[in-house]
From Swiss-Prot:
Assembly notes: Homodimer; disulfide-linked. Interacts with SOSTDC1. Interacts with GREM2, RGMA, RGMB and RGMC. Interacts with ASPN. Interacts with MAFP5. Interacts with FBN1 (via N-terminal domain) and FBN2. Interacts with type I receptor BMPR1A. Interacts with type II receptor BMPR2. Interacts with SCUBE3. Interacts with TNFAIP6 (primarily via Link domain); this interaction is inhibited by hyaluronan. Interacts with ERFE. Interacts with BMPR1A/ALK3; the interaction may induce HAMP expression.
Subcellular location, principal: secreted
Disordered, as annotated region: 269-291
Organism: Mus musculus (Mouse)
Protein name: Bone morphogenetic protein 2
Length: 394
């Protein structure tokens, strides 16, 4: 969608919301907008409402308005990722591996594994479990750049102060699952790491080759095998170290904080990759502007006012701004005009049939949004041309 169309959608938003759009905007959101308005607005036609809904949902890459349940939990990993890329104070320190992955992607998706975890037959000194992530919600036109499997490992009390307590975690792709005539599945090693048991932390494993085969090459997704190779005499200690399944008495909230997570980084071809948003400094002009001249004006979009805060996790709203004002003859330097606008304004001064130059955005920037999609999956996406940074006569 071109920048002009997006700006038009922002300006049309209050009118369309007050008019209805029942399939997109909840009744509560429409009532809030209606109560805030001091003058009645005419109801747009159903065709206009339908077109607006289609364009807005298309801009967000959605086919229908998400209606997530209240039990959906946003992984802390995704919240930290959003804070980092939106430039929020107190965000976690940059992770170089993560920064490289995000530098080529404009969409990050997270997936929890299916709760039913299959424990595979034990081999000497090893514990292995199979688990599965449903990736059917990844759009077919999204180009995958990388994928990571996040697994939490807990500190073992017996290992405190002893750095020799180690084990190896191996991650395999299942090529062919176990069957009646096949005791163990056929697997391919994806990543491996030697870890200490005396600390609690997340471990990230590169599973890009497997996820690319499943999502873009048409191979069947049989899941992963997580194998813990015990390097000590007591394998029972290490077995509790890697958290793949929920404990019997563990509550849902605490389990959601350490539950295994598959994270995909992709690009839909519709903008720039994720980046840390830097606050821009206002450009001060020496020349005094007329109050009515073309300039940027405040416009804050509050998602809670329109009932979108049930599926948009962050931000709660954003400063979109808009451009408005006169482009008088002669056009001053501070109006950021093109040569064509100068010529058009000159012709308008002698022939009123030719319209004046218009006050429009000349520079736009992106925002990062964290939201729940139609499948209740948590998505972090970079949306282009959402914030007006500069205005001019064009």
């Amino acid at each position: 969608m071109v920048a002009g169309t997006r700006c038009l959608l922002v300006l049309l938003l209050p009118q369309v919301l007050l008019g209805g759009a029942a399939g997109l905007i909840p009744e509560l959101g429409r009532k809030k907008f209606a109560a805030a308005s001091s003058r009645p607005l005419s109801r747009p036609s159903e065709d206009v409402l339908s077109e607006f809904e289609l364009r807005l949902l298309s801009m967000f890459g959605l086919k229908q308005r998400p209606t997530p349940s209240k039990d959906v939990v946003v992984p802390p990993y995704m919240l930290d990722l959003y804070r980092r890329h939106s430039g929020q104070p107190g965000a976690p320190a940059p992770d170089h591996r993560l920064e490289r992955a995000a530098s080529r992607a404009n969409t990050v998706r997270s997936f929890h594994h299916e709760e039913a975890v299959e424990e595979l037959p034990e081999m000497s000194g090893k514990t292995a479990r199979r688990f599965f992530f449903n990736l059917s919600s990844v759009p077919s036109d999204e180009f995958l750049t990388s994928a990571e499997l996040q697994i939490f490992r807990e500190q073992i009390q017996e290992a405190l102060g002893n750095s020799s307590f180690q084990h190896r975690i191996n991650i395999y792709e299942i090529i062919k699952p176990a069957a009646a005539n096949l005791k163990f599945p056929v697997t391919r090693l994806l990543d491996t790491r030697l870890v200490n048991q005396n600390t609690s932390q997340w471990e990230s494993f590169d599973v890009t080759p497997a996820v690319m085969r499943w999502t873009t090459q048409g191979h069947t997704n049989h899941g992963f095998v997580v194998e813990v190779a015990h390097l000590e005499e007591n394998p029972g200690v290490s077995k509790r170290h890697v958290r793949i399944s929920r404990s019997l008495h563990q509550d849902e909230h605490s389990w959601s904080q350490i539950r295994p997570l598959l994270v995909t980084f992709g690009h839909d071809g519709k903008g720039h990759p994720l980046h840390k948003r830097e606050k821009r400094q206002a450009k001060h002009k020496q020349r005094k502007r007329l109050k009515s001249s073309c300039k940027r004006h405040p416009l804050y979009v509050d998602f809670s006012d329109v009932g979108w805060n049930d599926w948009i996790v962050a931000p709660p709203g954003y400063h979109a701004f808009y451009c408005h004002g006169e482009c008088p003859f002669p056009l001053a330097d501070h109006l950021n005009s093109t040569n064509h606008a100068i010529v058009q304004t000159l012709v308008n001064s002698v022939n009123s049939k030719i319209p004046k130059a218009c006050c429009v955005p000349t520079e736009l920037s992106a925002i990062s949004m964290l939201y729940l999609d139609e499948n209740e999956k948590v998505v972090l996406k970079n949306y282009q041309d959402m914030v007006v940074e500069g205005c001019g006569c064009r």
